[in-house]
A protein has these predicted regions:
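A short SAM/SAH-binding and catalytic strip from SAM-dependent methyltransferases
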Residues: 34-49
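General small-molecule cofactor/ligand-binding pocket signal
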Residues: 16, 107-109
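Core SAM-dependent methyltransferase catalytic element
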Residues: 101-104, 111-128
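A short acidic, Gly/Pro-enriched loop at the edge of an enzyme's catalytic core
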Residues: 23-36
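Conserved class I S-adenosyl-L-methionine
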Residues: 64-95
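A short glycine-rich, Lys/Arg-flanked "PGG" loop and its adjoining helix->strand segment in the class I
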Residues: 49-64
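Class I SAM-dependent methyltransferase SAM/SAH-binding core
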Residues: 1-26
């Protein structure tokens, strides 16, 4: 979301605009969150493992990352590998990103609704 959209959302108590492709570190202190959510945007990260390591750092012990994915992407913005592998391989790729970044208990779930775009959820746990 852009700054204008975030400002217009009066349900938010806090927000920030931060380009993870130019600065892959999340702008929060260590051990801040119980959950980190990446919603249909992992395919646009140019340094995904660095970003995921940063996410691991801002999670508290037993915190979880949740990555929501679908088969759609903007070809002009998505990194090359996501455009050249099958959707099921994208799930495997993101799972390996999480493992390399240091997450445990990495799982992938298919939560696709009937007659709609697929929805895949990949999660990982910060053990300590």
């Amino acid at each position: 979301m852009n700054e204008q959209e975030l400002r217009a959302n009066n349900q938010l108590s806090d927000w920030c605009v931060h380009n993870l492709n130019t600065k892959p570190q999340l702008p929060y202190p260590a051990d801040t969150f119980d959950y980190v959510l990446c919603a249909v945007s992992i395919q646009y990260l140019t340094a995904p493992i660095e970003v995921l390591k940063s996410a691991l750092g801002v999670l508290r012990k037993r915190g979880r990352i949740v990555i929501a994915m679908s088969h759609r992407l903007f070809p002009t913005k998505a990194v090359s590998i996501f455009q050249h592998i099958a959707p099921e391989d994208r799930i495997k790729l993101v799972s390996s990103y999480l493992e390399i970044a240091g997450f445990d208990e990495v799982t992938a779930l298919d939560r696709s609704p009937t007659n709609a775009d697929p929805l895949w959820i990949v999660t990982g746990l910060k053990v300590s």
